[in-house]
Amino acid sequence: MELNILNKTNNELEVELRGETHTLLNLLKDLLIKDERVVTAFYDMKYVSISDPVLYIKTDGADPILVLKDVVAIIVSECDEFIDVFSKAANA
């Protein structure tokens, strides 16, 4: 994965995620819009088969980079929890 910050202000962030698909971007967007600091979050893929997705985040004044880091930490935590639960079930 390559990540390119296209634009950043105090409350907005525009990030291109090269080589990624709807799978990761939908997950990020869904968790971002649940965060109370986020005013809006969405992504765009101009040409689905040839474009890299661009994630847009607008916050209520919170640093959008910190908000995105927090959301990624939630994803990592949920994946770790899944690994634990799955491992226990697989060994039962």
From Swiss-Prot:
Gene3D superfamilies the UniProt entry points to: RNA polymerase, RBP11-like subunit (3.30.1360.10)
Coiled-coil stretches: none
Record GO biological process: DNA-templated transcription
Keyword Chaperone attached: no
Catalytic reactions of this protein: RNA(n) + a ribonucleoside 5'-triphosphate = RNA(n+1) + diphosphate
Keyword Nucleus: no
Protein name in the entry: DNA-directed RNA polymerase subunit Rpo11
Organism annotation: Methanosarcina mazei (strain ATCC BAA-159 / DSM 3647 / Goe1 / Go1 / JCM 11833 / OCM 88)
